[in-house]
Structure formats: C-alpha cells, structure tokens
Amino acid sequence: MALHNPQYIFGDFSPDEFNQFFVTPRSSVELPPYSGTQCGIQAEEELLDGQEHQRIEFGVDEVIEPSDGLQRAPSYSISSTLNPQAPEFILGCPTSKKTPDDIEKDETYSSIDQYPASALALESSSNAEAETLENDSGAGGLGQRERKKKKKRPPGYYSYLKDGSEEGASPAALVNGHATSVGTNSEGVEDPEFMVDMLPSVMPRTCDSPQNPMDLISDPVPDSPFPRTLGGDARTAGLPEGCRETDFEQPCLPTDNLLRTAVTQPNAGADTTENLAVANGKILESLGEGTAAANGVELHTDESADLDPAKPESQSPPAESALSVSGAISISQPAKSWASLFHDSKPSSSSPVAYVETKCSPPVPSPLASEKQMEVKEGLVPVSEDPVAIKIAELLETVTLVHKPVSLQPRGLINKGNWCYINATLQALVACPPMYHLMKFIPLYSKVQRPCTSTPMIDSFVRLMNEFTNMPVPPKPRQALGDKIVRDIRPGAAFEPTYIYRLLTVIKSSLSEKGRQEDAEEYLGFILNGLHEEMLSLKKLLSPTHEKHSVSNGPGSHLIEDEELEDTGEGSEDEWEQVGPKNKTSVTRQADFVQTPITGIFGGHIRSVVYQQSSKESATLQPFFTLQLDIQSDKIRTVQDALESLVARESVQGYTTKTKQEVEVSRRVTLEKLPPVLVLHLKRFVYEKTGGCQKLVKNIEYPVDLEISRELLSPGVKNKNFKCHRTYRLFAVVYHHGNSATGGHYTTDVFQIGLNGWLRIDDQTVKVINQYQVVRPSADRTAYLLYYRRVDLL
C-alpha cells in the first residue's frame, strides 16, 4: 500500500515564521489561580467576564480572544501545542503541490537541529498560517468547545484552523501529525520514513481516550535526542527513519532515533515531571524523568485544565477523529484526566496530562501485576522447591575452609533501633577469617535471580560479607611524641543491615518477642544454629539418608536423660563400651553428628560422664558452638579458673534408681574435641529463685594467648592433641556496658590484620586502640564473649 507525501496542517512556514514558532523563547505562563501578573502584551483588564485564563499565543504579538460568533465545523481542530505530530491535529487537510523551491529545500540540511531539512516537512505556502490566524480571530474560531464553555483551557492554547473541504481537497488521514492524502490524484512518494507510525484498523487511535489497553516503556530510549521531560516546549518536527512496516499487526521500531527535536530545550534533562500512563488497564506512575517513546509507544501531553469528569458524556465536547489508513471508523470519547481514573476529582491545572499512543506492540505485562506475582513467590519455600538450593548444596560439599587472615576495610553498622547486640555480634563474625571466606565462596543471588529461597540465613550472611572489601594499603605508621606509633584508619561508609534484622521475624525466633532481654550470646547461637540447620537441609538434597539423624544433631540438642540411658540397650548402634585408663570401662552414647562447614569452624564436643556405684560409667557426647563458663563462684577470677571449674567433678543430689533407692551419683565434663574457633561465654547473667535476673559485674581476666590444659581434655584425646592444637589467640571481644541485666549496650573490639592492631567498634563508630585497652579492666564495660582462633591455623 503506497503512502503519499504527507503535509502538515500548518501549511508552509517562512523562515521568519519558523523562527517565531519554533526557535524564539516562549513566554512564561501564570496558571490559575490568576495572580494578576501580566503574561503578555494585553493588560489584565482586557479579560472577559468569567474568564479565568488569559489567552496567549506564544511568540505572537496579539492575544486571541474567544468569540461567540460562528460555530466551528467538525473538520476544524484546536491544538495546545505547535507539535506537528500532536494527535489533536487528526482532521482533513488540503494537499498542496510541491514547488521547486520546496524540493530544493528538502535536499538541504537543517542547521537548527542538525537533521536533514526534509525531516521537517514544511511544504505549504508561507501565507497559509497567517490567513488561518486571521480567519480564526475574526470569526470566533475557538469553536464550539470554547463557545459553550464546557471546557476551560490554560494560557497558550492555540487555534490553528484549517477547512478540510476547501479547494476540493480529498480527505486526508493524519499519521502522527502528518496529513497523508488518501486520494488517487494526490502527489507523493512511498517512503518508509513515514510508514513507521501507521495505525491499524483494529485499534483506531483517539486523542482523549486513555482507557484502551496500552503499552508503557518507562525507560528513555538510549542515545535518543528528544527531550526527556514531557512539557509543552518539546516541539518535534521529524520522524523515525529506516523502518518499513508491511503488516500493521506487528510493531515497527526505528533503527535510528525515535523522535527528533526541532529546538534544543535547555531544561530537557531536568527530573522534575511526574508522568502517569496506562499499561494494560493498570495505572503506572513514573517518577522523575519523562518517559520516552520506545517499543511502539509515544507520549503526548495535553495541558488542558479544569477537566470535570463528573459532567455527563453528552455535554463533553467531541474528541477529534482519527482516520486510519485502512478506513477504520472514528471514535469519539470525552476528555478525561488521569486523576479521574483514581477518583472523581478535578486534576491540578498546573500538571500536564500524559497520553499514551500505541503502535500495535504486543501487550506488555503490567509491572504492578508482575510485582504481585513476585510477592506471591517470595518468602520461605521448602528446599525441594528451591531451584538454586541444589547448586549451593553442591558447592558446600566441595568447600574447603580457609583460615588465612584477610585485611578488610572496617565499616560501622547503623543502629536505628535496639540492635547493638546484633551489630556487635556481626562485627565479630566478619573478623573471623574462615567465616568470611565461607560466605564469600557462596554466590550472591539478587531478588530477581532468586525471588523465593529456602536458605534465608545463608543468603543474608552472604550479602553481609559482600558488604566488606579488602582494605586499601594503609599509610606508613607515623611517629608521635614519646616514640609512640600512631596508625591511621580509613573506615568505609557505615550501613544498616536491615536484611539481617529481618531474619528474627522471617525465621520466627523467640528473640523477636517483645520484652525479651537482648542477649548477644543468644543471638550468636541463633545465627550459628540457623546456618547449620540450613546447611543440613541442603545436604539432604544430595544424601537423603541424613534426614533421620537431623533431629538429634547440632549443639541445640539436649543431653540424653539418665533414665533414657538406662533404657537404652547395650546393643544400640549409638553406644559402645570404651576402655579407659586403668582398664576402666564406660558406655558411651553419641548421636550421629552430621558435619557442616559451620561445625567445621565453631563446632566442638564435650563429654559428660556419669559415675554411679556398682555400675559402668555412662558417657554422652554433646556438641557446642559456644563454651559456657560459670563465673559465679568467688574463686573464679580468670578464664583459666572458669575452665577448670567446668571440668571439676560434681555430685548429683537426689538421684534414684528404678527400685526407688537413692544412690550416689557424680558427673564430670571434659573437652572431647576443640574447634578451630573457640567462643567462650562468660555467664554474667544469673537467674534468682524469685524469677529475677542480675548481672555479675565482677572482672574476669582473659589472656590474648590462651592454652587449654591437658587436664581439661577427655582421657582418650589427651595424648592426641599437641600444644599447637590447644593454643588459641584472641581476635574479638564482645562487651556488655552497664550494671543492669535487663538493659545496657554492646560493643566489640576486633583484631585487624591489615593494621596489625585492634579496632573498637561501637555501632557506626570505628577507632584504633592498642592491645592493652582490650584486656584492661573497665568499670563501665565487662567482657561477655571471647573469640579465639587456633594458632596453628593463623
């Protein structure tokens, strides 16, 4: 189907008129309520009675006033912009012959917007526009809308009228502001440049109806030269090129630029507009930058003011018709603002209304609908329904724990709530090299890549460790007074790990209950047990046989009761008879511990042996992540004292057998297996019989280098652990500030390998301290958690 050379309904422009309409700066407009400021050459007193706006034609030396004279024929048009592609210009237009000058001008190059002058397509006589203005102003050409005052227009609303029936011109269909003659005698050429914006007959376009299903692309077109703001100042005078459409059912996108501007607007890039559009019947809001025409979508602004959606349809002025190339009938709908789609209220007269013009693109799913679908899929799902879980499980099967220290740039953690006990624990874990390397080994997935997850704890700590990067090369230490070395530290920007805080709610931990004491040791157990359980569930994907042992696995499991020990037969697969020193035998029971990378870092075992008269010893192995040290006794002043008290033999009072006979029973705890990272918990919070809780503020001395005595180990492993396997070095201390057990504050000191020194981190505050300040007693703070690493792994 051949398309003829289009004509603009404005006709031909002389150079002066072109500069007047497209180049000269526009006047400012005072929108209602009218402030009395003179916006043009007409004085305020010249306004008609009841008229709220001053009719101003930008760049023209006179004000066009409304007249109640002639009624406009339906073929006339009113436009609020000089944009020749505006959809308001859908009307008949006479076709004028090209003159040799016009043809020569088409071949020249326009210096206004650096595009070929043929793209401007200004082919009519130079006096057509002036005659139109004169006829309109003299004959009351503002038309039936203005005469009946059914619709109020803001300043700058133009009246360019053209009688489509003059001089026997054939009807023309306007395609994006270009009048294309459909007559057989009209002159034109078949140019693919003008075929890009053709509309199909199955979807006729109307100017004022935003209710049809439409597509919206919110991102501006890359490298597109047209303005990003959708103001009335964006005058377009070109068309996309290099796109031929043979089937109107398929979208046709330009290969070069979608729109070209005739005038470079100074504020084109300002992020000041708020655009509303409709996609598939949904209201979409794009804040900031204007929406570009892309994927077959164009946006046009209509600066109409005071549109009343509550008026009956019959009283609304008819919309201008669009004659499609295939002869589709015109559709007339009342003008509506975007605000009317939300509620029946008048839109602000100062806000431009953005309309969307579709180009037959396939329907794009609504982003709002996609978000709802995303919300349905988000959250916790079983491991079997998580497609990423199997990948993480395979990685964890092959992971090798790395204990090499890493120099990380310290970053504070913003505390907007009562999260100091969490922040202090997180800083200690970040300073733990094997923990850092483990989480960095697991890939970081975004919400888009993994909307639903079966491992929220792992995901959050992988994200946390990725917040920290290698520290830049520190400056050389500078000498200060007294030959004291002063080191500088440049911490990174503080951040708020909200995704870590949300874990308390996601996993429904008892720590999230209101009124509970916020305890750093309890939170550490929550983290390590949570990571361990998630890794166990991943192991089940590869080895389902682990499932039957998962209940009794991990430090969270309790010691088997003595009655249960008696009921267990000697042939149980979980027990065996062990021969100790001096040929003493004992029955040892142990759960089938499934190892995970977390137990490989923090997991140790303690042996609890029960001694009973005239009976074999009964031993139970129990895993731990933190070693609980009772410091309540007055004899305990150091960590070594607390460790010796841990392994001391104690009597169990009131123990009876099945025959109701009271027997003497004692119990002793020893260390069966020492972990690479040993966390000591100084139990400062003791519960009274009355139900209250008090804090032990006594000072407990702790060394930087800690050696675990052989006497603390179980008999079977005493000779298997060399001194290097029993020696630890301090790398983090979590302090509790205050004398109350129901409140206070938590801070952390961590060893920084890059500085070869210590840092004190109080939420988002980071400062350098010396080692003496770490171990020195203080009245306002007491050590609560001690983090040690084995020296043979340093």
Swiss-Prot record:
PANTHER family the record matches: UBIQUITIN CARBOXYL-TERMINAL HYDROLASE, UBIQUITIN CARBOXYL-TERMINAL HYDROLASE 10
Gene name of the encoded protein: Usp10
UniProt-recorded name of the protein: Ubiquitin carboxyl-terminal hydrolase 10
Subcellular location: Cytoplasm; Nucleus; Early endosome
Domain USP: 411-791
Record carries keyword Protease: yes
CDD domains reported in the protein's UniProt record: Peptidase_C19
Keyword annotations: Acetylation, Autophagy, Cytoplasm, DNA damage, DNA repair, Endosome, Hydrolase, Nucleus, Phosphoprotein, Protease, Thiol protease, Ubl conjugation, Ubl conjugation pathway
Protein task: Hydrolase that can remove conjugated ubiquitin from target proteins such as p53/TP53, RPS2/us5, RPS3/us3, RPS10/eS10, BECN1, SNX3 and CFTR. Acts as an essential regulator of p53/TP53 stability: in unstressed cells, specifically deubiquitinates p53/TP53 in the cytoplasm, leading to counteract MDM2 action and stabilize p53/TP53. Following DNA damage, translocates to the nucleus and deubiquitinates p53/TP53, leading to regulate the p53/TP53-dependent DNA damage response.
G3BP1-binding, as annotated region: 6-21
